[in-house]
């Protein structure tokens, strides 16, 4: 297993991670390569009770982590490409948003789109989290929307495939 990179070389805001009792012994999220955008989230399920997700079914998987995300940022929970490609397992509400003021346990909503049962085991890397800057927009009601060359065309109207 490749050792995760130390975060000491990362320049950016600090995100606090609180490890809950059922996540004891699991590694904290870390960047796995110098160019990685996301940190892997692991399943904090009991060793003796893997979580079985049947084809077409979904399950909320605990990570055993509470995050302290700086104001003005969010955590985006995204699928891991290998799980999606090899097993059809993906994050149902992708990207799932973890707001900066949320202080509950981060859980990952997984769905099995594959043809076989999938067992989520303790410590399995089930998703990734990407931290991003967000802004809050001011709301201004208008009677008409300003015109553009595109207009109201959508769903393939730009001619790109």
From Swiss-Prot:
GO molecular function, one term: magnesium ion binding
GO biological process: dUMP biosynthetic process; dUTP catabolic process
EC number: 3.6.1.23
EC top class named in words: hydrolase
Catalytic reaction equation(s): dUTP + H2O = dUMP + diphosphate + H(+)
Necessary cofactors: Mg(2+)
Entry-linked SUPFAM superfamilies: dUTPase-like
Pathway: Pyrimidine metabolism; dUMP biosynthesis; dUMP from dCTP (dUTP route): step 2/2
Binding site for substrate: 80-82, 93, 97-99, 107
Keywords annotated in UniProt: Hydrolase, Magnesium, Metal-binding, Nucleotide metabolism
Keyword Repeat: no
Cross-referenced Gene3D superfamilies: 2.70.40.10
Pfam families per UniProt: dUTPase
Family annotation (PANTHER family): DEOXYURIDINE 5'-TRIPHOSPHATE NUCLEOTIDOHYDROLASE
Family affiliation: Belongs to the dUTPase family.
UniProt function note: This enzyme is involved in nucleotide metabolism: it produces dUMP, the immediate precursor of thymidine nucleotides and it decreases the intracellular concentration of dUTP so that uracil cannot be incorporated into DNA.
Protein name in the entry: Deoxyuridine 5'-triphosphate nucleotidohydrolase
Source organism of this protein record: Mesorhizobium japonicum (strain LMG 29417 / CECT 9101 / MAFF 303099) (Mesorhizobium loti (strain MAFF 303099))
Top-level taxonomy: Bacteria, Pseudomonadati, Pseudomonadota, Alphaproteobacteria, Hyphomicrobiales
């Amino acid at each position: 297993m490749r050792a995760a990179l130390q975060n000491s070389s990362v320049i950016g805001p600090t995100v606090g991670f609180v490890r809950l009792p059922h996540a004891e012994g699991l590694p904290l999220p870390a960047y796995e390569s110098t160019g990685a955008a996301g940190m892997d989230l692991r399943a904090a399920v009991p060793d003796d009770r893997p979580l079985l997700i049947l084809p077409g079914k979904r399950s909320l998987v605990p990570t055993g982590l509470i995050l302290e995300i700086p104001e003005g940022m969010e955590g985006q929970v995204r699928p891991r490409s290998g799980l999606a490609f090899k097993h059809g397992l993906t994050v149902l509400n992708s990207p799932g948003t973890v707001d900066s003021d949320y202080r509950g346990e981060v859980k990952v909503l997984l769905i099995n789109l594959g043809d076989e049962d999938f067992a989520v085991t303790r410590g399995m890397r089930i998703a990734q989290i990407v931290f991003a800057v967000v802004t809050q927009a001011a709301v201004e009601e208008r009677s008409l929307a300003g015109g553009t060359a595109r207009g109201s065309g959508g769903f393939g109207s730009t001619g790109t495939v």
